[in-house]
UniProtKB/Swiss-Prot annotation:
Membrane topology: Peripheral membrane protein
Gene: cysA
Family: Belongs to the ABC transporter superfamily. Sulfate/tungstate importer (TC 3.A.1.6) family.
Binding partners and assembly: The complex is composed of two ATP-binding proteins (CysA), two transmembrane proteins (CysT and CysW) and a solute-binding protein (CysP).
Family matches, as PANTHER family: SPERMIDINE/PUTRESCINE IMPORT ATP-BINDING PROTEIN POTA, SPERMIDINE_PUTRESCINE IMPORT ATP-BINDING PROTEIN POTA
Domain ABC transporter: residue ranges: 3-237
Keyword entries, A-Z: ATP-binding, Cell inner membrane, Cell membrane, Membrane, Nucleotide-binding, Sulfate transport, Translocase, Transport
Reactions catalysed: sulfate(out) + ATP + H2O = sulfate(in) + ADP + phosphate + H(+); thiosulfate(out) + ATP + H2O = thiosulfate(in) + ADP + phosphate + H(+)
Record localization: Cell inner membrane
Binding site for ATP: G35, P36, S37, G38, C39, G40, K41, T42
EC number: 7.3.2.3
Major subcellular site: membrane
Name of the protein: Sulfate/thiosulfate import ATP-binding protein CysA
GO MF annotation, one: ABC-type thiosulfate transporter activity
């Protein structure tokens, strides 16, 4: 099921949430809407779902304009950040709910519903929890049940709004890898909202970077990271440094793309060490360059030669190995 977003705009009183957004999503694609809070990503997702109505523009599913269709007629599965499971129902009944609510003419019999529910619970690897209640589950288990429930009605499109945002970091990492594998198996057109660039990079086929109601860049994870279209995209997709070149503008580079030396070397900049911060396998060194307003951060392996006996206030010499001039 392909999705076309055509010139969509949306205002909330004086606030312009979306400004003439256009986007094509191919059938079977997993697309991330990535951006900071207030950028319009959730509003766009809700408009695709039919939960919000655009002021201008249209939404097209597989060539059909569905802008005037009710959310119930769009056949989308929606997974929210906070699970939205029914507390008084077992896991089995939660997953079966959508099937039992179908019109009588479309509703499967209870035998088929049971088969379908167990198929889905096996798919999310939680069939053994069918008789439990939501409060007896971990956060990660609840979110997988919420996903199974969304898939039970066989939606044409799966929409996920910050699906892992309420979970701790370790569980988020496990679940996003699981979601990427699951998507390969079900091949369902999916759109998910996130503000976590690492999550988008790991899960999505393509990333739509949004800011202040507009799309800044669309591309594969590699494309947007290696070839950002502007300063905003570069900074949003990871830690970054800015080195001013005066009238020639500035260059941007990542902390892990910095060469450090205790010895003065040609083309390296002198800088004062302001902070040394061990980060496990790496160490972050914060540097102050004379004449520069912004501090420079470098990350090197913890046993790097430049770190031996290094103390705050000493001078290091650095050079960006790779940089972007924007």
């Amino acid at each position: 099921m392909s999705i076309e977003v055509r010139n969509v705009s949306k205002n909330f009183n004086a606030f312009k949430a979306l400004n003439n957004i256009s986007l094509d999503i191919q059938s079977g694609e997993l697309v991330a809407l990535l951006g900071p809070s207030g950028c319009g990503k959730t509003t766009l997702l809700r408009i695709i779902a039919g939960l919000e109505t655009p002021d201008d523009g249209s939404i097209v599913f597989h060539g059909e304009d569905v802008s005037g269709h009710d959310v119930r007629d769009r056949n989308v599965g929606f997974v929210f950040q906070h699970y939205a499971l029914f507390r008084h129902m077992t896991v089995f009944d939660n997953v079966a709910f959508g099937l039992r609510m179908k019109p009588k003419s479309e509703r499967p019999n209870e035998t088929r519903i049971a088969e379908k529910v167990h198929e889905l619970l096996n798919m999310v690897q939680l069939d053994w929890l069918a008789d439990r209640y939501p409060e007896q589950l971990s956060g990660g288990q609840r979110q997988r049940i919420a996903l199974a429930r969304a898939l039970a009605v066989e939606p044409k499109v799966l929409l996920l709004d910050e699906p892992f945002g309420a979970l701790d970091a370790k569980v988020r990492k496990e679940l996003r890898r699981w979601l990427a594998r699951l998507h390969e198996d079900i091949n369902l057109t999916s759109v998910f909202v996130t503000h976590d660039q690492e999550e988008a990079m790991e899960v999505a086929d393509r990333i739509v970077v949004m800011n202040k109601g507009v799309i800044e860049q669309i591309g594969s994870p590699g494309e947007v990271y290696e070839n950002p279209s502007n300063d905003f995209v570069y900074h949003f997709l990871g830690d970054s440094n800015r080195l001013s070149l005066g009238d020639e503008g500035h260059v941007l580079f990542r902390p892990h793309e910095v060469s450090l030396s205790r010895q003065e070397i040609e083309d390296h900049h002198a800088a004062e060490v302001r902070d040394i911060r061990p980060l496990g396998a790496t160490t972050r060194v914060t540097l102050k360059v004379e004449g520069q307003n912004e501090l420079i951060e470098a990350e090197v392996v913890k046993d790097h030669d430049s770190l031996v006996g290094l103390a705050k206030g000493e001078t290091l010499f650095f050079k960006p190995k790779v940089w972007q001039k924007l």
